């Protein structure tokens, strides 16, 4: 059994601060040395004397320092040692009476810690200055278990106050699902923003808290999803705020009426002349949506053939087939004038085939207007076959190029277009077309076969800086 002792203290405040931590100690006193320590109380000559107590107040392990022990000492003393201590040390301590020794033994017992009373303080002549310090030092140890229990109880109460209560579970629906449910249940199939808020709060009590947070998300979902359309108020329905309804072409966005997961994302086709309309961003659970479904105005369901770029390429191809062949009077100035429409190629490509486009007088001008907008659009592999301009850094003589993979008739048709396109791209304004290229009108009208060797050695190798068989 070991007892621990705190040393080097001058004032009462120092001792109180030392014993705030019950695990702090410097040295230990064996229980077997207790009687010898009590017997040597008279011969204290190391750091202090029992009568004066004027030195620094430090005690050696051989001195009587049991009154300054921390809780480990009281718990480490056996009942026999505590009971035998008063009788064995009564005769050895001249300055202490039997009552004081008894009080000391009572104070050292685990059940009587903090029982230092006025009787012991009066009987201990030498320890008088420290009698007042013993009670404050021992009392925290006496009440330590109860204090710990009280602190645990108090901590439990505080933990309950800090614990967040969830009276209602969050519904497993995205904001788009909530808006769709609210609009579909309305008799008029359209609601204002405040009515959507109210419907959600009435049906789901979870959203009655933190309203500003989720209402912002509702507004963003309405603005950034094309399936929701804003409808202006009619004169017969005065009030504040516009109505929101579902897009007529959105259809059933949710599979089998289940709002837990959206089946597909609705994407509205933007007309070239339309100025408004929602953005194309995603809101709510848009990132988790299924594959996008683009709807053609004519009702076509093929997603690869109804994009505006695809229709624009087909429209231009149809115009090229029906365009008159340029006569000998088609000078480069005329071609440049018609090629000026290439700046608006992006808007022209978005025009559907059914719309009426202004006729282009020269075929090469139409050829130049299509490839000019190619760098801003990415084409699918089957669409790149219909495109009239290839990558300038790609060799057309590559074994796996798209030209070699096409049929012979399509390849000749493609190379015929290539001649005009390359001539328009690389020839300076006002200069004549290269004489080595077969640019006669007969080659356009009759589609006469053109050998690849007639185009590549004379022109392509001089234009491209990279090798002919470059695979990049």
Curated annotation (Swiss-Prot):
Residues 169-260 bind DNA. GO terms for biological process: alveolar secondary septum development; anatomical structure formation involved in morphogenesis; anatomical structure morphogenesis; cell differentiation; chromatin remodeling; dopaminergic neuron differentiation; dorsal/ventral neural tube patterning; epithelial cell maturation involved in prostate gland development. It comes from Homo sapiens (Human). Transcription factor that is involved in embryonic development, establishment of tissue-specific gene expression and regulation of gene expression in differentiated tissues. Is thought to act as a 'pioneer' factor opening the compacted chromatin for other proteins through interactions with nucleosomal core histones and thereby replacing linker histones at target enhancer and/or promoter sites. Binds DNA with the consensus sequence 5'-[AC]A[AT]T[AG]TT[GT][AG][CT]T[CT]-3'. This is Hepatocyte nuclear factor 3-alpha. It is found in: Nucleus. One of its GO terms (cellular component) is nucleus. The keyword ATP-binding does not apply. It comes from the Eukaryota. Binds DNA as a monomer. Interacts with FOXA2. Interacts with NKX2-1. Interacts with HDAC7. Interacts with the histone H3-H4 heterodimer. Associates with nucleosomes containing histone H2A. Interacts with AR. Interacts with NR0B2.
């Amino acid at each position: 059994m070991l007892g621990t002792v705190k040393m080097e203290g001058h004032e009462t405040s120092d001792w109180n601060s030392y014993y705030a931590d019950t695990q702090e100690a410097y040295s230990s006193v064996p229980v077997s040395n207790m009687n010898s320590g009590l017997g040597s109380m008279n011969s204290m000559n190391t750091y202090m004397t029992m009568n004066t107590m004027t030195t620094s107040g430090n005690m050696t392990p051989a001195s009587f320092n049991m009154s300054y022990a921390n809780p480990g000492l009281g718990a480490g003393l056996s009942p026999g040692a505590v009971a035998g201590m008063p009788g064995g040390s009564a005769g050895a301590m001249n300055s202490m009476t039997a009552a004081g020794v008894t009080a000391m033994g009572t104070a050292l017992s685990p059940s009587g810690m903090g029982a230092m009373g006025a009787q012991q303080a009066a009987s201990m002549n030498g320890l008088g200055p420290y009698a007042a310090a013993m009670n404050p030092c021992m009392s925290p140890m006496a009440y330590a278990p109860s204090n710990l229990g009280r602190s645990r109880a108090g901590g439990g109460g505080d933990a309950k106050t800090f614990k967040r209560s969830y009276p209602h579970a969050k519904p497993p629906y995205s904001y788009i699902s909530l808006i769709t449910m609210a609009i579909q249940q309305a008799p008029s199939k359209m609601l204002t923003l405040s009515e959507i808020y109210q419907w959600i709060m009435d049906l789901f009590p979870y959203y009655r808290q933190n309203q500003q947070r989720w209402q912002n998300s509702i507004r963003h979902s309405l603005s950034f999803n094309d399936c929701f359309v804003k409808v202006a108020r009619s004169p017969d329905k005065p009030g504040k705020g516009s109505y929101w309804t579902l897009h007529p072409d959105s259809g059933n966005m949710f599979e089998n009426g289940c709002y837990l997961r959206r089946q597909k994302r609705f994407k509205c086709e933007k007309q070239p002349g339309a100025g408004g309309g929602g953005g194309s961003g995603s809101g709510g659970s848009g990132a988790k949506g299924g594959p996008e479904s683009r709807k053609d105005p004519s009702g076509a369901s093929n997603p690869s053939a109804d994009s505006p770029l695809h229709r624009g390429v087909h429209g231009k191809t149809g115009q090229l087939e029906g365009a008159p062949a340029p006569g000998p009077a088609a000078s480069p100035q005329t071609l440049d004038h018609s090629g000026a429409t290439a700046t608006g190629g992006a808007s022209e490509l978005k025009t559907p085939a059914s719309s009426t486009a202004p006729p282009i007088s020269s075929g090469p001008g139409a050829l130049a207007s299509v490839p000019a907008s190619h760098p801003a659009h990415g084409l699918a592999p089957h669409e790149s076959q219909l495109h009239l301009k290839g990558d300038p850094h790609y060799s057309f003589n590559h074994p796996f190029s798209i030209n070699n993979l096409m049929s012979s008739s399509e390849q000749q048709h493609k190379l015929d277009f290539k001649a005009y396109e390359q001539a328009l791209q690389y020839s300076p304004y006002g200069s004549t077309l290269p004489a080595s290229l077969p640019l006669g009108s007969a080659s356009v009208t009759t589609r006469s076969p053109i050998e690849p060797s007639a185009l590549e050695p004379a022109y392509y190798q001089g234009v491209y800086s990279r090798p002919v068989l470059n695979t990049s």
